[in-house]
């Protein structure tokens, strides 16, 4: 199950497994890791004298996605009563250490790595799983641990907030850890802070953030109520550089922004009238406002289906256009000749126009050219005279 040299492995698909009990073998580790994905190789370095493994190993998967999935589901689970640490076995892992390492002392024996991680990850990104120092034989905690943060801002906040606080009914102590290759010098010096500020972690090396980051190109302390920032964010989101979003609430637009100038406010003595609303079907139109002094009120609108008449005859229908051949009822008949003239060619005069049949008990009106007929009987009302 062991593989060749590390350089032959796919480092992106290889994970590191630490905190292994002495009972764990390569076959057991294989059976555990195959639950996350297909395993290519398992390597557990062993001591040359005792031939026992040193408590850690490397597992190579078929792809990087399988390795990431194994880290998510298998990190901090207990194997033979000990929580194991699972993370990426990157060749440049040491370059991620900026020196923001803190020491946590006076821990209760019940405190494990997962509890420390859940407690201190609220202050910032933790690069590695918290390391609790344990007894080699029994595996019990020695009462102190080390936590490596990704920035000094996170470590300073954790030190200030957690020093002297109770964790599992014990007041813990939090301070910067001592350096390994120095004599009594702790982490968090000014030189380390300056070096960390000059060489920040690259985004590809930065672990997953617990909270969402600020959009790229926008400072974290920039208020979104600024006009330029609001337009820049909207243009970046929509992909249209010329897009101008509507102003935010409480903002005053500066300038015309390529539009028409705004309408000036009315003078104090004039009350602006609202624009008329078009009447909806089935509603009575709204009456016009009262006229000003010295002005006649406008005429009322005509009823539906009636056309407005000429001035002086409001509401009356217009007269029909004059017929080309005489009054109504004589359509198709030529006009009579003027008095003293005869029809050409000895033509007889046209017959009188025909009127529609009268109703029962009614007499038809006489022709216009004849005088009214005398009453035909007593008690009868004569017909009205013809129109002049």
Curated annotation (Swiss-Prot):
Major subcellular location class: nucleus
Biased amino acid composition, Pro residues: 261-325, 333-355, 362-388
Single Gene Ontology MF annotation: RNA binding
Subcellular location: Nucleus
RRM domain mapped to chain residues: 13-91, 100-179
One family name in Pfam for this protein: RRM_1
Record key words, sorted: mRNA processing, mRNA splicing, Nucleus, Repeat, RNA-binding, Spliceosome
SUPFAM superfamilies xref list: RNA-binding domain, RBD (SSF54928)
Gene3D superfamilies cross-referenced by the UniProt entry: 3.30.70.330
GO-annotated biological processes: mRNA splicing, via spliceosome
Similarity comment text for this entry: Belongs to the SF3B4 family.
Function as written in the Swiss-Prot or TrEMBL entry: Subunit of the splicing factor SF3B required for 'A' complex assembly formed by the stable binding of U2 snRNP to the branchpoint sequence (BPS) in pre-mRNA. Sequence independent binding of SF3A/SF3B complex upstream of the branch site is essential, it may anchor U2 snRNP to the pre-mRNA. May also be involved in the assembly of the 'E' complex. SF3B4 has been found in complex 'B' and 'C' as well. Belongs also to the minor U12-dependent spliceosome, which is involved in the splicing of rare class of nuclear pre-mRNA intron.
Protein name, UniProt field: Splicing factor 3B subunit 4
